[in-house]
Amino acid sequence: ASLLAGATPEDVKHGLSTFRGAKRRFEVILDGKGGTTALLDDYAHSPNEVRASIRSVKKLYPGRKVSVIFQPHLYTRTKDFAKEFAEALSEADQVIMPEIYPARELPIPGVDSMLILKDVTSSSKCYCERKDLLNLIKNSNFDILMTLGAADIDRLLPDIKKIIMGGGPE
């Protein structure tokens, strides 16, 4: 397609060699080489996408403990797919979940992150308000840490990266 649009073969080769992928789609922030903590981010916001992301990270880092911070997006999606989200998230070794990101929706009585988290079967799981996530991360050790969700969890990535690399948030 690029050649038909007028690009030269050299342009295509250069473009492919420097393409880093789509932002927030299995984006590697820290690669975890040499046994260091890996940090990844994915926009996954449906149960199938969450499951696929967790399975992919387990294949990329076999034998390593996968911790996931999943920020639910929308009350209606949480209500409609709570069981499916719990099943998908249960494939991670550890699940951390902040409150639902409401976007355009008003709260629905009885619908919160615990609707999903209560059915997660991972050996380690916890609810953590978004405002407290950086402190939780600072006081924890992670092998592989992945943020998931369509909301604004990715805005914490620069500070999470600094914490993992031995610094602190700005």
Regions found by a protein language model. Name each.
Residues 1-170:
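ATP-dependent carboxylate-amine ligase
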